[in-house]
Amino acid sequence: MSLNLKLKTIIFVLVSSLLTGCVAAVVTGAAVGMVYDRRGVMTMEADARLFHVIHKNIVTNRQFSDSRIEVTSFNRVVLLVGQTPSASLRVLAEKIAHNAPGVERVYDEVTVGYPIPLTQRTKDSWITGQVRSSMLARKGLESGSVRIVTENGVVYLMGVVTDQQATLAVDVARRVNGVRKVVKIFQYIR
């Protein structure tokens, strides 16, 4: 076996073992999330439907061709984040979300301006991952009951939680490097 082939084999084995760990972490995190998700199956299905309807209506509308709008639905509460070139398009996106059947509330956090660069979106993904990992490790916090959305360094926390869990979730998110602000969009268990 040549040295080059041996080196490739070693690299392949190392990368494969690292990816196996990532897959296990993702699968474990997803399983833990489902166990602690307080929404019923019908609500989860309704959230998926809401996402698809709103997302499709925005993406297929030519007026939004220069916009970047992300849609999140949790417990029939919709969060819109992203950027659009005009205030009128921001209003239109919110109207589309409000008109989707089954929506209880819409939080419109879309800003007027150019879409944020890929580098910032990559940082936002990293921040979301760090917040999620920290929540998994935090005792007293059922991370599956919290949806995390990060946009331009702002972390949005959605979910059905107790007052204590909300406080813990915000504390965890604030401690992550790169977080500029934390916005609570919680529904509280009383």
Regions found by a protein language model. Give the residues of each.
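N-terminal targeting leaders
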Residues: 2-6, 13-16, 21-190
